[in-house]
């Protein structure tokens, strides 16, 4: 990118998928890891208030989704009646269709956190990412991340790359809690949150 373009920019906001990180890493590594470990995670964390709340909200949103017979009781009126097999079936389907539901992203992030913690996962970024981040930071520019993945998932990727922990370069993180990337008002909310004029922000 020409330096002249960045002269009038105070903040660089980066997407993850296809921008800092290969798309294949998200779809073939992270999504696959989530699916492979989903049943065990739900079994271990079924009584977790955070997980139960996320599942209940997903049930309310997707109770009419037709997957297969194993997901039939996901449409029950109470989470107490929903089996681990049913919840796993529905969530696997949502992962397959790349659902951006924040509740799904929360659960994915928690599964990935276990993988990063025990070394089964390692963040992947393009080789020019740490170089660019270091340059922008030295030039006094702020760096933020805006991705459909949860803030937790974002931090996990950048804290465990083969180039080391890159989170010291990043000022803030935003996920679908601020709004969808396809909605113009989401970017206005980010500008307000970081207290910068939109014309001083570059989204890549």
Stretch-by-stretch model annotation:
Residues 26-93:
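Conserved phosphoryl-transfer catalytic core
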Residues 65-127:
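Metal-dependent phosphoesterase signature
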Residues 175-182:
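Conserved nucleotide-cofactor-binding alpha/beta core module
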Residues 6-7, 139-140, 194-197:
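Glycine-rich phosphate-binding loop signature in dinucleotide/nucleotide-binding domains
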Residues 109-110, 118-161, 173:
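Substrate-recognition element of Asp-dependent hydrolases with the DxDx(T/V) motif
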Residues 182-204:
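Conserved Lys-Pro-Asp/Glu-containing loop-to-beta segment of HAD-superfamily phosphomonoesterases
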Residues 163-171:
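Short, conserved catalytic or adaptor-binding loops enriched in Gly and charged residues
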